[in-house]
Regions:
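N-terminal Lys/Arg-rich, disordered targeting/topogenic segments
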Residues: 1-11
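Terminal "cap-and-tail" regions of soluble proteins that handle hydrophobic small molecules
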Residues: 9-19, 39, 43-64, 175-193
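Hydrophobic membrane-insertion alpha-helices, especially the h-region
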Residues: 13-32
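Core segments of small alpha/beta cavity-forming domains
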Residues: 28-102, 106-107
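Beta-strand elements of well-folded, non-transmembrane domains
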Residues: 54, 119-125, 152-156
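Surface-exposed, charged secondary-structure patches
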Residues: 84-136, 191
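Low-complexity, intrinsically disordered terminal/linker segments enriched in charged
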Residues: 129-193
């Protein structure tokens, strides 16, 4: 009986250890999978949002990244389509977009994730629409980026952004032309013919 008990305890303890290791590996796998999916939704979705605000086009793709309720309440997107956006007077041809994900956490068993991101648009290329020349400044206004607390929700196996709260503001500085140095006069004037 003593040997049977030892034999059973040996296999039970090994089974428990293997079960714990497999559980940790499965949990880590799902956390990584959720984090990767969320990261893609954040980077692609927020860039598509900025593109839509700057150019007033491409709104058809926003539903892939944002929940419909969020899109209906986003004042920046509404401004792009009702003509109140400061970028509506410009033909934006290109922009640089920088998104830094500072914090991202998604439990494998949870359908809600939160993250902290910093969004910047360091440069915007374009020019004033011909119909608006003289009405607005030739310099395109700087993008008001910032730090955001973003909430995502998984529904139907897809992560979508459902909330975006700005916790800090970052305004890109206006580009100023680099000063050119004044040439120094020749110290040796005798060398001149």
């Amino acid at each position: 009986m003593k040997y049977v008990r030892r034999f059973m305890w040996f296999w039970a303890s090994r089974l428990l250890i293997v079960t714990l290791v497999v559980s940790i590996v499965v949990c880590a796998f799902y956390m990584c999978m959720n984090s990767a999916n969320i990261y893609i939704v954040l980077t692609d979705g927020l860039e598509a949002r900025v593109r839509t605000i700057l150019t007033a086009s491409g709104a058809e793709t926003l539903g892939d990244y944002f929940h419909a309720d969020f899109l209906n309440q986003d004042t920046a997107l509404q401004g792009a389509f009702n003509g109140t956006s400061v970028f509506g007077a410009y033909n934006i041809t290109d922009f640089d977009y920088v998104l830094s994900v500072e914090k991202l956490w998604a439990w494998p068993w949870d359908d809600v994730a939160t993250c902290t991101v910093t969004e910047r648009v360091p440069s915007i290329t374009g020019k004033v629409l011909s119909s608006r020349k003289g009405e607005v400044d030739e310099q395109i206004p700087a993008w008001q980026g910032g730090r955001y607390e973003i909430t995502l929700k998984r529904s139907g196996g897809k992560w979508k952004i459902v909330g975006m709260k700005q916790t800090g503001i970052y305004i890109e500085p206006d580009p100023t032309p680099e000063p050119t140095p004044t040439p120094k006069p020749e110290e040796n004037l005798e060398a001149m013919p």
